[in-house]
Amino acid sequence: MTQANLSETLFKPRFKHPETSTLVRRFNHGAQPPVQSALDGKTIPHWYRMINRLMWIWRGIDPREILDVQARIVMSDAERTDDDLYDTVIGYRGGNWIYEWAIQAMVWQQKACAEEDPQLSGRHWLHAATLYNIAAYPHLKGDDLAEQAQALSNRAYEEAAQRLPGTMRQMEFTVPGGAPITGFLHMPKGDGPFPTVLMCGGLDAMQTDYYSLYERYFAPRGIAMLTIDMPSVGFSSKWKLTQDSSLLHQHVLKALPNVPWVDHTRVAAFGFRFGANVAVRLAYLESPRLKAVACLGPVVHTLLSDFKCQQQVPEMYLDVLASRLGMHDASDEALRVELNRYSLKVQGLLGRRCPTPMLSGYWKNDPFSPEEDSRLITSSSADGKLLEIPFNPVYRNFDKGLQEITGWIEKRLC
């Protein structure tokens, strides 16, 4: 495989690429309070992006590696879109966020190519894929360099999957009225068909960001994991996010009886952040096809409908929402009106009785997902479970919460 040559071809300078923070042209709120969240990281002065250390470390990145790349970005004296924000260096060069993380990924890519041990090589490929995804973060539409980093991440992920334990199959799903989408089915050792979890990820993540979830939590329990990208990013980039947020996942669910490795009678959905919006919609609209739905830090009502809550959210996250909705130059008022339509309570779903068992995990004082959203989910279910996850120590409690959630899913699938 000529991965290095592909990197050179994709990133070859052709014109002045737009800088990430300029892609969504909203009216800024001005000064914002500091934000810290287990799933989204924290706002740090002089950075446009939220720095999501917990999730990056959870995905296998060494904390020192994160600091090294950040230091290279900070030390750059190249031209920036905003002199006050380190990660706004213009163009694919030293100091640019995408450049520095992609360069770091290429180091691991080279290690993977040089490594003779297949499993270790697979680990290096996975590491490279994760770093390329961080390079592309927060995956805004129209970010040419980020889209090229995503392409490299997908290639590295495919290389990793050929070498790591278990089996991964790349699958194409037909969606009427538009382009087909691609998903990854991760299967544990043994003979299928397997009970399967359909992963519904957050808006600022790619489907390839969840390998750790499969490897540490689902595979040891003999459960397969099926991922697809959220609308408007990655392999689903030709689909815009609409109020029918679960459209793509519904078509995947309906196709599962034709997938021989999946036991379509034992399927659950698991939603992170806005992915919970998708998962809970599935619980209502596709209850005969689902044994259970689990959510973590769900974005299903408050953030979408409460102006005060939206004011507490960092600029980057609002840019992500605007980008997914195709509202790159809309006013904040227009964005608020549109977001309100995505509330599952406003849509008339949440609050109605749902036959599907639903669990929702939350952190107290989470700026993106208050406890009320999780209570709304679990109280709407005929078999609901509310799970509070203490914030500190953040990594240990995150792991403990995931163990409890996957155990709950296993009981309903197996």
Swiss-Prot record:
Any one Pfam family match given in the protein's UniProt record, by short name: FrsA-like
GO function terms (MF aspect): carboxylesterase activity
InterPro entries per record: AB_hydrolase_fold, FrsA, FrsA-like, FrsA_esterase
Record field: catalytic activity: a carboxylic ester + H2O = an alcohol + a carboxylate + H(+)
Enzyme Commission no: 3.1.1.1
Keywords linked to the UniProt accession: Hydrolase, Serine esterase
Domain of life the protein comes from: Bacteria
Family stated for the protein in its record: Belongs to the FrsA family.
Function: Catalyzes the hydrolysis of esters.
Name of protein: Esterase FrsA
Organism: Shigella sonnei (strain Ss046)
Taxonomy of the source species: Bacteria, Pseudomonadati, Pseudomonadota, Gammaproteobacteria, Enterobacterales
